[in-house]
Amino acid sequence: MGTLDGRVAVVTGAGMGIGRGIAGALAREGASVVVAEIDEAAGTDTAQWLRDEWGAQAEFVRTDVTDKEQVLAMVDAATDRFGRLDILVNNAWRGSGFARLENMTDEKLRAGFDMAVMAAFWAMQAALPELEKRGTGRVINLCSLNGVNAHMYSVQYNAAKEALRTLTRTAAREWAPRQVCCNVICPGAQSEAYRRVAEADPEMAAGMAAANPMGRVGDPLEDIGPVAAFLAGDASRYLTGNTLFVDGGAHINGVQWAPSVD
């Protein structure tokens, strides 16, 4: 018996990286999973992986989280396919890279807020009627140590992720009487963003791993996923409004690397 048997989760950006790892950890504990992903091949692959690896019920729903109607359809897919929704994980992100603050454009900054803040806002609003039904409602939003520490040349990412963290805390305060727990994970793991950095600058990626107190970058399934599964289950029923740094201790000294920019 898994800790999430009978529960239903929606995970955005579940086709790869941290989102895929979280989807796997939830499925491993017995949850049915809606794999919300813009990349059809990646999303289909993740859903099949969940079925093959853990015998999970998994449904791929192609979702552009910057499109409100698609976000609403994603939430509806959970109840249409599985009859309920207990867990909402807002993870999707696709940024525009590094830039000095003075070179950041209005369009790129807005795009970051659409991807992180508006997407989660729409999903949380739409999901609330289901989340509050059974006392099992959980919202898990993925934010970043980079935002907390104001990492250089990452204004789009930092501002959007910190706004999402405040949105989460506000929801935690307002929805606590409804027994809907809302928490943040700030992961240090092999995300797609990390993979792109590693491909572009292997030396920087090696330095990032070396700077971590544990000497490595976390694994999405085995390091981040179990924390998400804990937050999704009954053991976290008295935990809300928190930010969990799941990063091998990286938050102790802060971000120790800086990207190269023009």
Where in the sequence are the language-model features?
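Conserved glycine-rich cofactor-binding loop
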Residues: 8, 15-17
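Active-site-adjacent segment of SDR/Rossmann-fold oxidoreductases
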Residues: 29, 149, 158, 170-180, ...
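Short C-terminal tail/terminal secondary-structure segment
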Residues: 98, 240-262
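Catalytic Tyr-X3-Lys loop
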Residues: 102-121, 136, 140, 157, ...
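Amphipathic alpha-helical dimer-interface segment in Rossmann-like NAD(P)H-dependent oxidoreductases
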Residues: 115-133, 172-173, 177, 233
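Active-site helix of classical SDR
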Residues: 124, 160, 168
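Residue(s) in the substrate-gating loop at a strand-loop-helix junction
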Residues: 144
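C-terminal helical subdomain
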Residues: 177, 184, 203-239, 246-248
